[in-house]
Amino acid sequence: MTNWLGTLFARAMDAGVRWQLGRLPVELPAPGTWTPADPHEFWAASRLRDPAPIAVGPPLEHEVEGVELRTLTGPSRGPGSDLGSRSLVATAHLRPGRRDLPFVLVVHGLLAPSPWYEERQCRALAEMGAHAARIDLPLHLRRRLPGVRSGEGFISADLSWTRDIVRQSVEDCAAVLAWARREVSDRVAVCGTSLGGLIALLLAAQLDLDSVAALAPLCDPAETVLDRLPRRTRRAVGLDGGRGGVWGPDRDSARMVIGAALAPIVARSFQPPATPGERIAIVRPTLDEVVGDGPMKELAADWAAELWSYPEGHISVLNVRGLGVRVREWLVSRHSAMAGRAQRAAPGQGSWATA
């Protein structure tokens, strides 16, 4: 594919994503929903140090020799009140009795209609000889609200809601990782795409993990809100024409308010991250028109993380030949900064293996 045709294809795919985002219902936030929050206090009040317990269901099938497919469930706490907001769910591909193999958690993006990409990654990781799991974020997939599309309602003009549901997502993933560290493997890793990339980076900021890969991550939600929202959404919240909407008289005022409110879910608020930068890889599509590539480059520099740049868009980067293999090899590899750093929980009895 010639360069100009590839660029056109990448931009067309990103335009389709922006069109979908622009079709989401928008409600003006109530006063007081954009109060500033201290990033460190915000996460100190989380469940990261006291993760929810995980229950493991019976084996569903043996798709690959030596691999068991299990459903993971557990309690969840967040701003929503529906059933899907109160319980987490994940699907794991496990190799019983093999603590020596790494465990990789795969996290999907915003509005994911199905887990096809994440399931494909899990199957490929299992075939490589790893444990793997994919998790459904609040309001997505098996946790969606009845009668609405997957992911609708996750991102809101109510900034306190948005930061709280992102924290809930990080807590849910942390619960699965804590279980995996205790029951499954001595090494745990995370891979996320777009919104899932943000979740992966926030996990890296707060927890000492063995390997992290973030593909086209939403590194700076505040900047994306101000500079990347679809035109229809910008008009609905009053951010068109240089205005600041409900957050201020102009864009500069709104930038300060939104930045202070969403600071806890901006990865670069945390320096240095709990996971050393040598274990973190950020995949940067330089043509990204959905979240923008600038914050990815800045974060990689701030954290001294690996930066893999491709002349692709937010969606087309997922189809780059060889990238999937490169990411999977990164996730299962032992990195030079790993020795003695990641906290090791005492191995459990692995009771799931006989359930």
Question: Where do the model's predicted regions map?
Answer:
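Conserved acidic catalytic loop of the alpha/beta-hydrolase fold
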Residues: 170-186
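Gly/Ala-rich beta-loop-alpha elbow adjacent to hydrolase catalytic centers
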Residues: 191-200
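Cap/lid segment of the alpha/beta-hydrolase catalytic domain
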Residues: 111-115, 119-167
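Short beta-strand element of the alpha/beta-hydrolase
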Residues: 100-109
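A short loop-to-beta-strand scaffold at the N-terminal edge of the catalytic core in hydrolase folds
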Residues: 82-95
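Serine-hydrolase catalytic core
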Residues: 249-342
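Hydrolase active-site cap/lid region
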Residues: 202-254
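N-terminal targeting or regulatory segments adjacent to alpha/beta-hydrolase or S9 domains
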Residues: 1-77, 345-355
